[in-house]
Amino acid sequence: MDKISAPFFSGTSPAAASVAGVDEDDRLCFQAQELMFAYNISMVLRAAIQLGLLDALSAAGGKALTPNELVENVETSSNKAEAAAAVDRILRYLSCFNVVTCSSEAAGPDGTLVRRYTTGPLCRWLTKDRGDGTLSPFAVFVVDPDHLFPWHHIAEAVTAGGPSAFERTQKWPYYEYMGKNQRLGTLFDNAMAQHSVILVTKMLERFKGFDGVQRLVDVGGGTGSTLGMITSKYKHMTGINYDLPHVIAQGLPLPGVEHVAGDMYESIPTGDAVLLQWITLMLNDDEFVKILSNCHNALPKDGKVIVVDGILPENPDSSLTARDAFTLDIIMFVLFKGAKQRTEKEFARLAKQAGFTGGIKKTYIFFNFYALEFTK
C-alpha cells in the first residue's frame, strides 16, 4: 500500500502556513506547540460526540445549521445562548481538522458573524453506525479518564520496569480490569464491535482467503459477530467462535456459528483455517508463538492461520500510515507488557518458529490492516 500523507502535524503547520513572514524557526515552534496540545482534538471530538453534535449535522442532510439550532436538542442546565456559544467554539475548532465544515455570514446592523456548520469529510466515520461501522464509540472510549490515567505513568514504566503502565496504575492486567470496571468494559466492547464491523466489511470485499474454507475457527471472537458476517457471505462455511467462558456466555445466536469456550493458551478447536483478528499486537513474542503453535496443532496439512492486524514499517517516517502503525505500537507498550506491532519480517520469523513453513501471503484490507496467511 502506498504511504498516505498526514493531514496535520505533518511538518508544515497549517497555522504557520497562513501567517505571512513565517520563517523556519517559527514553523518549528508552531509544530512543537501542535504536538504539545495534540490531546485537545481527542477531547473536543469526544465532547462533540457525547453532545450529539455530529449526529445532528449528519441528520440535517447537508443543511447548514447554526449553533443556536444545534443546542435545541442538547439537554443543558445553562441558558441556551451560553450553550450555543460553547457549541460554536467546539465546532469551529473541529472545522480546522476537517471534522465539520464552517461557513459564516454577517447578520444584523452591527455585522456580527453568524457561523453555520455542516458535516466535514471525517464525519463519515464519526457519526452513528449506518450498517458499515463507526469509530465514534472508540473516540469516546480511548480518552475516558479510567483508560487515559496510565498514560501519565509512561516514564515510570521505563525507569522502574516490570508491569505495563496500565497494570501498574490500575492494579490489574488489561482484560481483567475491563471485566471489573463494567462501565469502561461496556465502552470497550462497543468500540471493538464497531471497529470490527468496519474491518470485516472491507475484508469481505477485498480478501479472498476464505474461499474454499469449510471450517473457520475465530480465536478470541467475542460474541461471534465477526463470524456471523463471514458465514453470511460464505454459506458453505461452519464457524467456530472460540473465546473464554464468560465471553461465550454472551454469544449471539447466529446461523452457521457454533460457540466453544476455552483458553487459546491451552488449545484451539480443529478447523481448516484459524482467524486471529486484531489479537497478535496484544501479545508478547512468547505468547504469540505459543498460540500460533496451538493453531498449527489444530490445522490439517495445508491448513492456514489468517492474522488480521497492522504491519509495522521497518523505519519510522512522517506519513499517516507510519504514524498510525507506530501509534498502535506505543498504545500496546502502555497497555500490555511485551505487546507490540510487528514488522513483516518479525511475523515471518515467529510463524516459522511455530512450525509454519509455507510462507506468508499478504493482502491489504483497510486503514492500515492486512490479512496475513500463514500456511502449514
Swiss-Prot record:
<dbReference type="InterPro" id="IPR029063">
    <property type="entry name" value="SAM-dependent_MTases_sf"/>
</dbReference>
<dbReference type="GO" id="GO:0102913">
    <property type="term" value="F:3-aminomethylindole N-methyltransferase activity"/>
</dbReference>
<comment type="function">
    <text>Methylates 3-aminomethylindole (AMI) and N-methyl-3-aminomethylindole (MAMI), two substrates involved in gramine biosynthesis, a toxic indole alkaloid. Can use S-adenosyl-L-methionine (AdoMet) as a methyl donor. Unable to mediate caffeic acid O-methylation.</text>
</comment>
<comment type="similarity">
    <text>Belongs to the class I-like SAM-binding methyltransferase superfamily. Cation-independent O-methyltransferase family.</text>
</comment>
<dbReference type="GO" id="GO:0009753">
    <property type="term" value="P:response to jasmonic acid"/>
</dbReference>
<keyword id="KW-0808">Transferase</keyword>
<dbReference type="InterPro" id="IPR016461">
    <property type="entry name" value="COMT-like"/>
</dbReference>
<dbReference type="InterPro" id="IPR012967">
    <property type="entry name" value="Plant_O-MeTrfase_dimerisation"/>
</dbReference>
<keyword id="KW-0489">Methyltransferase</keyword>
<feature type="binding site">
    <location>
        <position position="263"/>
    </location>
    <ligand>
        <name>S-adenosyl-L-homocysteine</name>
    </ligand>
</feature>
<dbReference type="GO" id="GO:0046983">
    <property type="term" value="F:protein dimerization activity"/>
</dbReference>
<dbReference type="GO" id="GO:0009266">
    <property type="term" value="P:response to temperature stimulus"/>
</dbReference>
<dbReference type="GO" id="GO:0009058">
    <property type="term" value="P:biosynthetic process"/>
</dbReference>
<dbReference type="InterPro" id="IPR001077">
    <property type="entry name" value="O_MeTrfase_dom"/>
</dbReference>
<keyword id="KW-0949">S-adenosyl-L-methionine</keyword>
<dbReference type="InterPro" id="IPR036388">
    <property type="entry name" value="WH-like_DNA-bd_sf"/>
</dbReference>
<dbReference type="Pfam" id="PF00891">
    <property type="entry name" value="Methyltransf_2"/>
</dbReference>
<feature type="binding site">
    <location>
        <position position="264"/>
    </location>
    <ligand>
        <name>S-adenosyl-L-homocysteine</name>
    </ligand>
</feature>
<dbReference type="GO" id="GO:0008171">
    <property type="term" value="F:O-methyltransferase activity"/>
</dbReference>
<dbReference type="InterPro" id="IPR036390">
    <property type="entry name" value="WH_DNA-bd_sf"/>
</dbReference>
<dbReference type="Pfam" id="PF08100">
    <property type="entry name" value="Dimerisation"/>
</dbReference>
<dbReference type="GO" id="GO:0032259">
    <property type="term" value="P:methylation"/>
</dbReference>
<comment type="pathway">
    <text>Alkaloid biosynthesis.</text>
</comment>
<feature type="binding site">
    <location>
        <position position="243"/>
    </location>
    <ligand>
        <name>S-adenosyl-L-homocysteine</name>
    </ligand>
</feature>
<protein>
    <recommendedName>
        <fullName>3-aminomethylindole N-methyltransferase</fullName>
        <ecNumber>2.1.1.340</ecNumber>
    </recommendedName>
</protein>
<feature type="binding site">
    <location>
        <position position="220"/>
    </location>
    <ligand>
        <name>S-adenosyl-L-homocysteine</name>
    </ligand>
</feature>
<dbReference type="GO" id="GO:0008757">
    <property type="term" value="F:S-adenosylmethionine-dependent methyltransferase activity"/>
</dbReference>
